[in-house]
């Protein structure tokens, strides 16, 4: 097995980012999932060294493996991330497709977020000594909600953070003692972690303190409930940092997940009891195949590829945004101070919101922008950096069916021509219900089944493949939204028609905005010249001699609200 150190490619406007170490098998097998390892706080990727040979022995074959140091640790000690979202985005960039994530402690919490946000490239999740919520949520307690009983008390965590700020060396020594506490192989764990500790207060303290804050910020309870991939969670029964009871409670959040525990193990069971951990992982990998969303992968790739030219080609999309803002928010009044743009693309909708509602840019205002396509998010950030208003926008790379936000985060959400790409519309609307505050609004535009009627009809004269995406009817969208608990306030539909001078012109524009065929049943490979000629002949049946070839769109504008009283939606 060969080892290769790889520096991930960077966008032109930023320096190269994270190192990763890749172990390549001598005889790689196609379509085999790549094992990607993320370490915990206060360590680096070297803590996997003693475990990997035992794991490979249990698996009985070689695997491609990738080991990543978090920013500020190990080979990436000279890198820092401004915030949690930036860190997650950079990690997602270097994780290969068809990955199985294996994370320990903080690495497990980060792996859970990544799996939740990227079902298109992460097929399985394995966590070791990982709590869904590491620190108790004071706001939850203040609101009278049932807290996660198995999280660390905030006062205890604050004492640790303050101790690290005042005396990092002494605090790290204490941390190693906590990780080995209760383990039957306590001396082995202590010696291993001490020998691998590499810390410089001068250069790394700020980055390590930032990483500590991630333990406070991450709340994976919703992510675990929504996770579509198979998952295994391993706990030590004597863990002094993450009680084994957290695993039993996690089973209540996600009944299909595997939860295992190891007697006489503490916080680092892969170090003290490697054979037991390896056996559990081997059993899981053999019985649980990766579950990747190929559709979401195609969506992310299509829109990322279209990002640079999108604004020059998206004439319908801009028109629909203008109509959506006018229809749903044009009557005046306050839209709230914390808003979400779901499927933000290159940010045109945000531009319109900032123009029409300047109060959003006040110090207490905040816009969150989420998209699954990294290229779109990069382009949007670049635009708003140039405009000088990026300070008021939080950018999130993620999946709209598993929103990375706590309950009741937003006063409102706007989403233009995004909902039609949902793989599970009920899950999407349920997530939106969860993320909205009581009384919050959700304004959306989406496409109906008559969209691209002429193109679909022309293709039917040529072959049986699904060349045009399928979209839900207005009644179906309304039914799913109400099933999720949202109330329909207003809606309208329109059928704009765009004209093209040729079929090539139409197809290039669809591809240029990323909206070419995503559905299953499409034809793979390139289209032959004879097939394309038959399509052109069929499409000529709709030719308007004065304006060209028509392309009809069916657009729905829908305004929903979450009831002030949740019982009203029951």
Curated annotation (Swiss-Prot):
Its EC number is 3.1.1.1, 2.1.1.197. Keywords: Biotin biosynthesis, Hydrolase, Methyltransferase, Multifunctional enzyme, S-adenosyl-L-methionine, Transferase. Residues 12-25 have a biased composition (Basic and acidic residues). Residues 1-29 are annotated as: Disordered. Residues 280-570 are annotated as: Malonyl-ACP O-methyltransferase. It catalyses: a carboxylic ester + H2O = an alcohol + a carboxylate + H(+); malonyl-[ACP] + S-adenosyl-L-methionine = malonyl-[ACP] methyl ester + S-adenosyl-L-homocysteine. InterPro entries: AB_hydrolase_1, AB_hydrolase_fold, BioC, Carboxylesterase_BioH, Methyltransf_11, SAM-dependent_MTases_sf. In the N-terminal section; belongs to the AB hydrolase superfamily. Carboxylesterase BioH family. HAMAP family: BioC. This is Biotin biosynthesis bifunctional protein BioHC.
């Amino acid at each position: 097995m060969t080892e290769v150190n790889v520096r991930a490619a960077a966008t032109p406007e930023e320096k190269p980012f994270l190192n990763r170490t890749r172990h390549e098998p001598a005889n790689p097998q196609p379509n085999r999932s790549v094992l990607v390892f993320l370490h915990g706080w206060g360590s680096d990727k070297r803590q996997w060294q003693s475990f990997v040979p035992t794991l490979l022995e249990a698996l009985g074959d070689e695997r491609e493996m990738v080991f990543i140091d978090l920013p500020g640790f190990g080979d990436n000690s000279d890198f820092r991330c401004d915030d949690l979202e930036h860190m997650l985005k950079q990690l997602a960039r270097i994780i290969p497709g068809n990955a199985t994530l294996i994370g320990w402690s903080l690495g497990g919490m980060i792996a859970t977020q990544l799996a939740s946000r990227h079902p298109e490239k992460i097929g399985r999740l394995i966590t070791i000594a990982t709590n869904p919520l590491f620190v108790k949520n004071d706001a939850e307690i203040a609101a009278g909600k049932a807290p996660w009983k198995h999280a660390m008390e905030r006062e205890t965590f604050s004492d640790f953070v303050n101790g690290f700020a005042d005396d990092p060396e002494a605090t790290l020594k204490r941390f190693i003692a906590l990780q080995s506490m209760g383990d039957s192989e306590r001396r082995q764990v202590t010696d291993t972690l001490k020998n691998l500790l590499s810390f410089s207060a001068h250069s790394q303290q700020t980055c390590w303190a930032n990483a500590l804050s991630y333990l406070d910020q991450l709340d994976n309870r919703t992510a675990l409930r929504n996770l579509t991939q198979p998952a295994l969670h391993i706990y030590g029964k004597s863990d002094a940092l993450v009680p084994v009871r957290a695993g039993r409670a996690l089973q209540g959040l996600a009944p299909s997940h595997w939860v295992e525990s190891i007697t006489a193990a503490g916080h680092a069971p892969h170090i003290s009891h490697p054979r037991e951990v390896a056996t559990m992982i081997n059993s899981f990998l053999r019985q649980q195949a990766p579950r990747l969303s190929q559709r979401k992968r195609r969506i992310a790739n299509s829109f990322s590829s279209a990002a640079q030219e999108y604004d020059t080609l998206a004439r319908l999309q801009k028109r629909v945004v203008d109509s959506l803002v006018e229809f749903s928010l044009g009557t005046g009044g306050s839209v709230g101070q914390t808003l979400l743009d779901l499927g933000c693309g290159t940010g045109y909708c945000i531009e319109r919101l900032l123009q029409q509602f300047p109060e959003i840019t006040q110090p207490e205002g905040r816009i969150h922008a989420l998209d699954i396509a990294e290229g779109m998010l990069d382009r949007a950030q670049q635009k708003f950096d140039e405009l000088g208003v990026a300070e008021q926008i939080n950018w999130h790379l993620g999946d709209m069916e598993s929103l990375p936000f706590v309950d009741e985060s937003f006063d409102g959400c706007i989403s233009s021509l995004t909902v039609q790409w949902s793989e599970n519309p009920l899950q999407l609307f349920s997530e939106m219900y969860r993320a909205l505050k009581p009384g919050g609004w959700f304004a959306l535009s989406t496409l109906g089944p008559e969209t691209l009627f002429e193109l679909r009809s022309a293709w039917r004269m040529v072959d049986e493949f699904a060349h045009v995406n399928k979209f839900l009817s207005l009644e179906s969208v309304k039914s799913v939204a109400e099933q999720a608990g949202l109330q329909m306030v207003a809606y309208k539909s329109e059928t704009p028609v765009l004209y093209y001078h040729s079929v090539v012109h139409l197809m290039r524009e669809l591809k240029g905005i990323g909206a070419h065929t995503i559905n299953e049943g499409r034809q793979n490979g390139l289209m032959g010249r004879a097939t394309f000629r038959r399509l052109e002949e069929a499409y000529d049946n709709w030719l308007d001699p004065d304006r060209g070839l028509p392309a009809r769109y069916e657009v729905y504008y829908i305004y929903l609200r979450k009831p002030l009283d949740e019982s009203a939606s029951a």
